[in-house]
Regions:
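Solvent-exposed beta-strand/loop surfaces of large extracellular or lumenal domains
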Residues: 448-472, 491-499
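C-terminal beta-rich recognition modules with glycine/proline-rich loops and embedded aromatic residues
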Residues: 269, 323-429, 464, 484-578
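Carbohydrate-binding/catalytic loop surfaces
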Residues: 40-41, 45-66, 111-128, 168-203, ...
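Beta-strand-rich binding/interaction modules
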Residues: 435-455
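Low-complexity, Ser/Thr/Pro/Gly-enriched N-terminal "stalk/linker" regions
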Residues: 17-74, 78-113, 144-151, 161, ...
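Structural helix-adjacent loops and short alpha-helical linkers that scaffold large soluble proteins
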Residues: 82-97, 136-150, 211-225, 257-270, ...
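Catalytic-core region of carbohydrate-active enzymes that cleave or remodel glycosidic bonds
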Residues: 258-278, 293-342
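Well-ordered alpha-helical segments within folded domains of soluble proteins
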Residues: 66-84, 93, 121-138, 195-212, ...
Length: 578
């Protein structure tokens, strides 16, 4: 079993490929199957339970915990995304949208009108409302929604022009070691009611940028620029910014780059994503809730953001390291935190700060935010099934799905089936092709060994360029492309060097992170060899060690806080518990 470091080497990519962007296929042309579809369906069903129905979803200021618009916006967003990914009509979304105007204030946004100060959590919550409404409009094209989007943008965000430049970013002024799973207003400085979720105002920035993308309203540009400039001045690590808010802001930067054509914003997002990878990502690719606060908990909202951001940075750079990172986030973090009811919950953060190598449940379900964002996360996984760039089709992830690429009046349809990530076989059946000759681009992940490719059972030479496989050919209906490869177990250094010991390591089988559910602490050597067996465990040939993947499909036992410990950090000597 090899020992390697997981290091993204991106310097050649940051400046060289800034103008390249590949685009995902439309939801209408993607039908996912298998475990991903089941995850989407369970999340969709959860978002249609009573808590999220029209008579319950609209909250007072007190009920929301001073987060006006947050629950409503995230719920609309989750339902819109789940609906597109599953191709099912939401049961209650129309009624929610019909009732929405009744719950807006006299200025057309959620929460009270505060004439004398800026309310950070109100801007964040209404930012989610903007995101939900924008995605609803893009999906339905219902023009009346534009008036609500415009009122929120004009009467709440535009009203704050000049205030964003003085948003308090001095670490010495901010209360940096407080906060619960749901943030709260913790202090007032310089005309700002500030949240313990430090930096959540920039969640609103992402919503405003998407509103601008749709409205194309020039008056919003100075406000967006003011918010962007202030975000770029924040020392995320020193101020201990919330990772979810910071990653959402970075997604906003990429969105703004796509709108403006200014690739500087991609570069700035990339720099901050690297900071997050070093100081904000846990040992199984979840997140510390705040930068540098290693004794806290994770939040699937940020996991969703990190997954989306990794793929979006790949779109702009074509750096395959981002694809590998996205795979590990998906299987070991996003899937890990989806609970038995389809919602999403928080985990602990194994490492030195909490003195444990064990991954465990912290909160069964973050029903107030992460369950809804999980809908967007899973839907983006479906959307990212395939991408196109000047006629080249990229299939960056292996999924069970049917998808179609349409170019003018011509198209090609594939049915993809695979046993990955447990096995190394992927098959693409061509249902029909009127495009003629085309180029397909598959990933050649670093964990894929002895790759072979065949068409209709006849093996062909693999055209591997770096970590991509390219196939340029003319396909007809019923043709079959097959990929075969071997997956191996690999040792990797810890993700966060500040919160782990130098002798500790992580184990992977392909993208799947391995763990021990044994009652006793497991010790491993760097050269320990593990092989998968039919019972789902990985066994060592020369010891009684057996491990499993932390990935699960909504395991009903992973629910109660502290009841299902999995060892994910391994070392040669036993860790002394204090």
């Amino acid at each position: 079993m090899r020992f390697r470091s997981f290091i993204l080497c991106l310097c050649p990519f940051i400046m060289g490929y800034g103008n390249i962007q590949v685009s995902p296929l439309a939801f209408d042309d993607i039908y996912v199957k298998g475990e991903l579809l089941k995850r989407l369906e369970y999340n969709f069903m959860r978002l249609e339970e009573e808590k999220y129905q029209p008579h319950k979803v609209f909250l007072t200021m007190q009920q929301s915990g001073d987060w006006p618009g947050d629950t409503e916006g995230r719920t609309i967003l989750g339902l819109v995304m789940d609906a597109q990914a599953t191709h099912r009509t939401p049961r209650y979304l129309k009624d929610i949208m019909t009732l929405l105007p009744e719950h807006l204030n006299e200025n057309g946004y959620m929460g009270p009108v505060f004439p004398d100060f800026m309310h950070e959590q109100q801007l964040a919550g209404n930012g989610w409302l903007l995101r939900g409404l924008c995605e609803y409009y893009l999906w339905t094209q219902e023009e009346w929604v534009l008036d609500i989007i415009r009122n929120i943008a004009d009467n709440l965000f535009l009203k704050g022009k000049g205030c964003y430049a003085r948003y308090p970013i001095n670490p010495k002024e901010r209360k940096r070691n407080i906060g619960a799973e749901s943030g709260n207003i913790s202090q007032t400085i310089n005309g700002w009611k500030l949240s313990s979720d430090i930096g959540c105002v920039f969640i609103g920035m992402d919503g405003l940028i998407q509103a601008y993308e749709i409205l194309k309203q020039a008056s919003l540009v100075p406000v967006i620029d003011e918010m962007v400039n202030r975000f770029l001045q924040v020392d995320l690590l020193e101020i201990k910014a919330q990772t979810h808010a910071s990653l959402t802001a970075c997604r906003g930067l990429i969105r703004y780059a796509d709108i403006s054509g200014n690739q500087r914003y991609v570069n700035e997002a990339e720099k901050r994503f690297h900071l997050y990878m070093e100081y904000g990502m846990t040992e199984n690719y979840e997140n510390y809730n705040w930068f540098g606060r290693y004794d806290t908990w994770t939040e699937p909202c940020a996991i969703v953001d990190s997954y989306m951001l990794a793929v979006q940075l790949w779109q702009h750079t074509l750096n395959p390291d981002y694809l590998e990172l996205a795979e590990k986030i998906y299987y070991n973090a996003l899937c890990r935190t989806q609970r038995r009811n389809g919602g999403f919950g928080c985990d602990n953060c194994p490492g030195l700060a909490i003195k444990t190598p064990y991954l465990n449940v912290h909160t069964p379900e973050a029903h107030w935010c992460c369950t809804m964002r999980g809908g967007e996360g899973l839907s983006r996984v479906a959307e990212y099934t395939a991408f196109v760039d000047n006629g080249k089709i990229y299939i960056p992830f292996f999924r069970n799905a049917e998808f179609k690429y349409v170019s003018g009046f011509r198209s090609i349809t594939f049915v993809e089936s695979t046993d990955y990530p447990w096995g190394g076989k992927v098959k693409f059946l061509v249902k029909g092709n009127s495009l003629g000759k085309l180029t397909l681009c598959f990933p050649a992940y670093s964990w894929m060994k002895r790759i072979r490719m065949s068409i209709n059972g006849k093996e062909i030479a693999c055209n591997q360029q770096g970590r991509y496989l390219q196939l340029n050919t003319r396909l007809k209906a019923q043709d079959e492309i097959e990929l075969h490869f071997v997956l191996e177990t690999v040792c990797q250094r810890p993700v966060n060097r500040q919160n782990t010991r130098p002798d500790e390591m992580l184990l992977f089988y392909g993208p799947l992170q391995l763990c021990s559910d044994s009652d006793s602490h497991i010790l491993l050597q760097n050269d320990t060899k593990l092989a998968p067996q039919s019972d789902g465990y990985f066994y060592s040939d020369d010891s009684d060690v057996h491990l499993k993947s932390i990935y699960h499909l909504m395991n009903p036992h992973i629910w109660e806080s502290g009841k299902t410990p999995f060892q994910i950090l391994f070392s040669k000597k036993k860790i002394r518990q204090e």
